[in-house]
Each structure stands twice: as structure tokens, then as C-alpha cells.
Design a protein with these regions (language model features):
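Beta-stranded membrane pore/translocator domains
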Residues: 133-139, 147-153, 157-159, 164, ...
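Outer-membrane beta-barrel pore proteins
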Residues: 117-119, 146-148, 199-207, 255
């Protein structure tokens, strides 16, 4: 049964985002990616009035899923609940529950009462102070958001002494969106143009194939700056943009009930590139591919990726992929599927309810390497508590073998939350960490112990952070970290932490604050 309310677990947002994007773990997220989806979560889209281009631009849906949603609304009327959404072909209970963060299901009467001319001002400020082995530093991030109804949004940010802005207009009829200032561009599978959001090289099975978001407003440090717009008519979507550095981009996509087909082109200072992409669902099978060419300084480079899913049943599927990159393929804003120049790879994956596993073998001349991961997730109920657990093993073989085992468990029952993790890594030497965290939904305390004597055996663990900031610190040395996280979900948040080192390394501390007006 689909849960009627969101869990009290304060990490649910990150967990939902990991599942929707098909990532291996929360450590695979990036600050710019989290910032983008936090902004989207603050102003959820109405799934009943969102266009095809708007649904695709979230990056959560395949063209087949979007077609299923639009066909359902056309045949049956508005979707009135997330339980109803879960019954649509290609969605399911888990995905519908995760989408609660980013969408709303407004009934027609409520839609008619809402004014699209309401002025919505919002100002956010994030500040941090750090003291460590490096000279002390003060970091600030101030963000301001002004909106006029649902159509006009202005974003402004100052990171330390670097200002950024972005103004977005949602148009009518054929003009879907116009952006002036900072923007991100994510097309096809990312071979030619995929800026702003970085992900790890190896994904969960769902992440073998990416869902592009097109052009979106952004004030992150990795944004492009210029003018961009998205146009749509019937089943076609056209995205065009021009940056201050002279990068011209264009993407044309054509969508059917079963798939999508697109062409992407770019030009910058004498260099040019083009790619073709397709994704189609036929019965139990989903096929996707993209091929790209890039010409610069008299040299032509190429890259390609393709794969196949077999969707046996809900939460039961297998998949495979191949990908390759030439030595001379060097697009600046590309995310070339985790490959080095001249490298190619093949991979397999399976997702079978609570168990999933992926692995790939990479080739580069005479060099051979491989990597993979296996996960087992489980849930249980004990009284009023919802208990979730995960066992995870990841491995990598290059010049030597590296293994990492991770076991984590959390229990939440409003208003309480408890969690912990044990993580062991075997590379050149042994290393490990463990932590316990407990508290209320608005206040959480964590104590973490780590022992990683060599830098090559360092460990990473997600640390809960204030909105507008995201951190996956590397733990190196031997020490104990204590942190406290307190928040008012709608107004403010404070995080304070202190790390004691049991060696000659200097202790360090950090304080972060977030205020929203």
C-alpha cells in the first residue's frame, strides 16, 4: 500500500532523488544537482497541467512514461492522488511515492481558484565558517528568488564575491521557456552537451540510460551564461541557446507514444559537433543509443553509447550497455559516460525487487579494468517504526583489487529518527568508518569514527547539510567527528561539527547557517 504521508526520515529527499535518477548511492549526488532539485521541490509542478516538455525536463521520466501519463489524463481526466498515479503503466508505487517531493495533484476546482498572477518573493542565505589545517576561511552563499505567479522566476546568487543571476519565463502556446542569464543544458545521453550536473561513472541499473532535462534555469557555479529558449509544437521540442563565450547550441526532439528521437548540434570558436539520439520501448524491451562527432583544430573525434533493457515485470528487469570514446573526442561540456580518452566498455545489470547488481569491463589499448557493485535493500515495520536497511558491496580492479563493504540501517517513527552505518574498505590497506545518528525530525546528532591511514584508502560518507549546500567529505587519518543539525523546515537550518584527530593532524571545525525569508 502506498504510504499516505511522507516518512519522518530527514534523508528521504536525497534517497528519493537517488532512486529517481538511477544513482548508486547518495554519495553520487553533487551540490549543483541537489541545488537544482531543491529549487524544484520548493515549487512543485502540477502533474495534470504540465506539458510533455515540462515532464521530460525533470529528468525523472522516459518518453514512454510521459506518454502514459498524458494518455491517462486525456482518457480519464485529472490525476487526483499519488495512489492513482502509481497505477499508471510504467510508474509504480515506489516512483509515485518519490515524486511527492516534486509534483502535486491538484483537482480541477483547486486549479481554477489559483491565480497565475500571484507575486511570490523569497530570499535565501547560506553561510559557513571553517577552521582546519588550511588557513581559516569564511564562505558565504546568498540566494534570492522572486516570482510572479507560475510564469516568471528570477534567481540571484552571490557565492563569496561571485554574483550570478537567471531569469526564466514560461511562455504560452509554442514558447515553453525563455531563460536569460545562467542555465544548464542536458541533451540526449550527454555525449555532446551535459553541463552543470556531475554524476559518478557507475550507476544503478536505472542509470544506464539517462533522461535529459533540456534547458533549465540555474545559478550554480557550473552554469552556462547567456540566452536560451525551448519551443514545442505537437510532438516536437526545439531547444536553442547562445552563451557569452560564443557557444551556440541546438537540439531538436521528436516524441511518440513509444519513444524519442533527437538531433543535437553545437558550435564554439571554430569547433563544432553533432549527435543523434534515440530511445524506444517495444513490448518488454527498451532500446537507447547516441552517437556523437566533434571537430576541433583539424581533428575529428567520436563517441557512442547504447544499451537495452528487458522489463520483465514491475521492479524486475535486466539490462546491458556498450560505450566507446576516441582519443580525440574532447568536448568541454560533455559528460562522456565515465570514459577516459580512447577507452571503451561493456556492462550488464539486474534489478530484481530488493536486490540489484551492475558491473562493467573497460578496455584501453592493452589496459583492462573492471568495476561493479551489488546491493540488497530491505524494509520492515516494528510498532510505529519504519525500518530500512541496505547491504552494499562495490569493487574495482585496475592495477590492483579494491573492495568496499557497507551496511546501513535506519528507523523512523514520527517524530524520532535513528540511523547508522558500518563501512569497510580494502585497497592497499584496510580502512573503515562507522557512525550513529539519532534525534527528531528537526534536530539530529551524529557521531562518526574513521580510520584510514593512507590517502588511497580514504572513505566517503554523505553528511546531512543545510539547504543550498551539499557535502560528501573524504575521511582520511584517524579521528572522531561529532556534528549537530537543527532546522525549521520552512525557515532556517544550522549545522555545526568538530573533528578530533588521534594523530598530529590539526583538529577542524565547521559551522553552517541557512535562512529563508
Amino acid at each position: 500500500m502506498l504510504s499516505a504521508v511522507l516518512s519522518a526520515n530527514p534523508g528521504d529527499f536525497s534517497a528519493s532523488l537517488v532512486r529517481l535518477l538511477g544513482l548508486e548511492s547518495v554519495e553520487s549526488l553533487s551540490e549543483t544537482l541537489v541545488e537544482h532539485y531543491e529549487q524544484m521541490s520548493a515549487h512543485p509542478l502540477d502533474i495534470n497541467t504540465s506539458s510533455r516538455a515540462e515532464l521530460l525536463s525533470t529528468g525523472f521520466f522516459t518518453p514512454f512514461q510521459v506518454a502514459s501519463i498524458l494518455d491517462y489524463i486525456s482518457d480519464n481526466g485529472p490525476i487526483l492522488s499519488f495512489f492513482e498515479l502509481s497505477g499508471i503503466i510504467g510508474i509504480g508505487e515506489q516512483m509515485a511515492d518519490d515524486l511527492r517531493w516534486f509534483f502535486r495533484c491538484d483537482p480541477p476546482r483547486r486549479q481554477s481558484l489559483k491565480s497565475n498572477r500571484a507575486y511570490r518573493p523569497e530570499v535565501k542565505f547560506t553561510g559557513s565558517i571553517r577552521e582546519s589545517v588550511r588557513p581559516s576561511g569564511v564562505g558565504t552563499l546568498a540566494k534570492c528568488e522572486l516570482a510572479y505567479g507560475e510564469r516568471v522566476t528570477a534567481l540571484m546568487a552571490i557565492r563569496d564575491d561571485r554574483p550570478a543571476f537567471s531569469v526564466s519565463l514560461s511562455g504560452r502556446r509554442h514558447l515553453e521557456k525563455l531563460v536569460v542569464g545562467g542555465f544548464n543544458a542536458r541533451f540526449a545521453q550527454g555525449l555532446l552537451l551535459w553541463n552543470g550536473f556531475s554524476m559518478s561513472g557507475l550507476y544503478d541499473l536505472a542509470g544506464f540510460s539517462r533522461n535529459p532535462t533540456g534547458l533549465s534555469s540555474s545559478v550554480s557555479s557550473a552554469s552556462l551564461v547567456g540566452v536560451a529558449s525551448t519551443w514545442s509544437w505537437k510532438r516536437s521540442v526545439l531547444g536553442i541557446g547562445l552563451t557569452e563565450k560564443g557557444l551556440a547550441i541546438m537540439n531538436y526532439g521528436f516524441y511518440t507514444a513509444r519513444g524519442s528521437y533527437s538531433l543535437t548540434a553545437l558550435y564554439e570558436n571554430g569547433a563544432c559537433g553533432a549527435s543523434a539520439d534515440m530511445k524506444a520501448t517495444l513490448g518488454l524491451f527498451t532500446l537507447w543509443s547516441e552517437g556523437a562527432l566533434y571537430y576541433k583544430d583539424g581533428v575529428l573525434g567520436s563517441a557512442a553509447v547504447g544499451g537495452l533493457y528487458c522489463n520483465i515485470a514491475y521492479r524486475k528487469r535486466v539490462g546491458a550497455f556498450v560505450k566507446a570514446r576516441s582519443e580525440s573526442f574532447s568536448v568541454q561540456n560533455s559528460n562522456v559516460t565515465g570514459l577516459k580518452p580512447g577507452q571503451s566498455a561493456v556492462g550488464l545489470g539486474v534489478d530484481w525487487q530488493v536486490f540489484s547488481a551492475v558491473g562493467e569491463v573497460l578496455f584501453r589499448g592493452q589496459e583492462l579494468s573492471a568495476r561493479g557493485l551489488e546491493k540488497w535493500n530491505w524494509t520492515a515495520e516494528w510498532g510505529e517504526f519504519q525500518i530500512e536497511g541496505e547491504l552494499r558491496h562495490s569493487w574495482k580492479y585496475a592495477s590492483g583489487m579494491k573492495n568496499e563493504m557497507r551496511a546501513s540501517v535506519s528507523a523512523s517513527g514520527a517524530p524520532f529518527y535513528y540511523g547508522g552505518r558500518v563501512q569497510v574498505h580494502k585497497g592497499k590497506d584496510w580502512s573503515g568508518l562507522c557512525y550513529l545518528e539519532a534525534g527528531l525530525r528537526q534536530a539530529l546528532c551524529r557521531v562518526l569514527y574513521f580510520d584510514a591511514r593512507k590517502w588511497d584508502d580514504r572513505l566517503y560518507a554523505y553528511a546531512r547539510d543545510v539547504p543550498g549546500s551539499f557535502s560528501v567529505p573524504a575521511y582520511y587519518g584517524k579521528g572522531l567527528e561529532c556534528s549537530l543539525f537543527v532546522r525549521d523546515p520552512k525557515r532556517w537550518a544550522i549545522k555545526a561539527g568538530y573533528t578530533f584527530y588521534f594523530s598530529d593532524k590539526a583538529d577542524k571545525w565547521e559551522v553552517k547557517a541557512y535562512v529563508r525569508f
